[in-house]
């Protein structure tokens, strides 16, 4: 999050709080910890992060709101694959929740502002109960497609899935495959027989 965000970060934090309450009811209040990190290092000081938590009425045990220096934030965002860019009214950034296992390794990434509860609770359940599994190829592919095809719509002030990006990719790959097929077929047809 960044604490000067007026809409998306507070809304996302409230949604996450609802899911954390649900997860803790199912898995136990001490079964996992939550850390929210402010990435706007000049402004997201520990005091600003504490104020943001109070403003969001997030006073759950085991949930820390933290700030960091610029170098630590650069390394953390690189390790987590979190992207953000300066924008005229703050930042454009991924909306991302990262599940980290007991060894400090990224276990699962969840993207989006209003994701379904099981997307976060199921990986937590796997880790808490010791039944971890890796994401299937299709789940991983689906997550990557969601990552690159989710766009911000300023008219509605919401993020949405843009099917045209996905459709354009499929058309492009199909066209490329067809051209490759035709080139190979023509090359084989014109090749001299030995």
Cite the ranges covered by each PLM segment.
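Juxtamembrane/start-of-transmembrane alpha-helix segments at the extracytoplasmic/lumenal side
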Residues: 152-173
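Extracytoplasmic/lumenal ectodomains and periplasmic regions of secretory and membrane proteins
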Residues: 86-145
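Structural microenvironment flanking redox-active thiols in thiol-disulfide oxidoreductases
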Residues: 11-73
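Juxtamembrane interface at the cytosolic side of transmembrane helices
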Residues: 175-194
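Sec-exported extracytoplasmic/periplasmic mature domains
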Residues: 21-28, 54-58, 78-82, 105, ...
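A residue-level detector for well-ordered beta-strand positions
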Residues: 98, 150-151
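Aromatic-flanked redox-active Cys/Sec active sites in thiol-based oxidoreductases
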Residues: 1-6, 39
